[in-house]
Design a protein with these regions (language model features):
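Conserved adenosyl
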Residues: 113-251, 256-258, 274
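Short acidic, hydrophobic short linear motifs in intrinsically disordered regions
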Residues: 46-54
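A short glycine-rich, Lys/Arg-flanked "PGG" loop and its adjoining helix->strand segment in the class I
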Residues: 257-269
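Conserved Class I S-adenosyl-L-methionine-dependent methyltransferase catalytic core
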Residues: 7, 14-40, 64-175
């Protein structure tokens, strides 16, 4: 038997206790979002459990226990003298304001899907098969949209589009844009709001997502210049697009090379292909950090199985 280093053992066990706490608190974050608890606290200053209960209509005993868990997690500040709880302005941006560029609740919905789909991914591991995007729990779809929408709101018009030479001017004048792998249409709608003279079509093979995207476009008031169609990355119709965009989806595709060839066929001669992907280093050792940990985990549960379920199955992963 190998000799055990007690110091290292204690450190690992201590770290896992912290992991247990993080995992146990995750459902409470989702509850805080679903029940409007964070929104009720955002900008309201210190409040007691009774006041939060009155604002939300929830039973005070539940409100108090939830607040104590939030304080233990460091998400809210607790005043032991006044017995009040406060969500900081920063906490409001991260937890209570869906349109904030720092909003992160969507990521918790993605984590929820990962747990709910555990048996399916386990089967794929054993069988060596894949798990299609459409086979996941529905909270993956909504969570992905909510998580990435914050970044699209913050970056698409101010920095990403201007990074393509002359593209902002073309979009302002009126261009044809295809958004491939659009999901619920967050990126498409952000672009349509920013460039009302252009026309946009979002493509996704997942029919429920396309239905949701159409409804979102109507709600946003951009349905006059935005349409959504069910189509894959290698089969979407249309020619002569001034811009084809792939936002956070290329690495999930089974045949990204085939998708790239199709993009070339559908672009105008002077068109541009815009690819936005989460940043990762090329070497494993350079990704052994908190962000890399999230990427490798999400890739194991979602991205790699998704690619392996498709033709070619290149499985780029994280």
């Amino acid at each position: 038997m190998q000799q055990i280093d007690d110091t290292r053992l204690d450190a690992l066990m201590g770290r896992l206790v912290g992991e247990f706490g993080a995992l146990a608190s995750a459902p409470l974050v989702i509850l805080g979002d679903r029940l409007g608890l964070y929104k009720a606290m955002a900008g309201a200053g210190p409040m007691s459990a009774d006041r939060l209960s009155a604002k939300t209509g929830l039973r005070v005993r539940y409100a108090r226990e939830w607040l104590n868990a939030q304080a233990a997690s460091g998400f809210v500040d607790y005043d032991p003298v006044e017995e009040t709880y406060a969500l900081s302005p920063e906490g409001g941006l991260v937890l209570g304001e869906p349109d904030s560029p720092a909003f992160m609740i969507g990521g918790y919905e993605v984590l929820s899907a990962m747990f709910q789909d555990l048996d399916k991914v386990q089967k794929a591991f054993v069988d060596g098969t894949g798990l299609g995007w459409h086979e996941h729990n529905a909270c993956l779809f909504s969570g992905t949209e909510r998580f990435f929408r914050a970044g699209y709101n913050a970056n698409l018009e101010p920095s990403w589009i201007p990074a393509l030479d002359g593209m902002a001017e073309r979009l302002r004048a009126g261009a044809r844009v295809a958004d491939v792998g659009c999901g619920f249409g967050a990126s498409t709608i952000v672009l349509a709001k920013a460039y009302p003279a252009s026309t946009f079509v979002g493509y996704d093979y997942h029919e429920p997502s396309i239905a949701a995207a159409r409804e979102r476009a109507r709600e946003a008031g951009v349905a006059d210049r935005v349409s959504f169609e069910v189509a894959g990355a290698k089969t979407y119709p249309g020619r002569g697009f001034d811009l084809v965009a792939f936002f956070d989806c290329l690495h999930d595709m089974g045949d990204p090379v085939g998708a790239a060839k199709h993009v070339r066929q559908t672009l105008a001669d002077d068109g541009s292909w815009m690819i936005v992907e989460p940043f990762a280093n090329d070497r494993v050792e350079d990704n052994l950090n908190p962000v890399g940990r999230i990427y490798y985990s999400a890739s194991t549960m979602v991205c790699t199985p998704c690619s392996l379920s498709q033709e070619v199955g290149l499985a780029l992963g994280a």
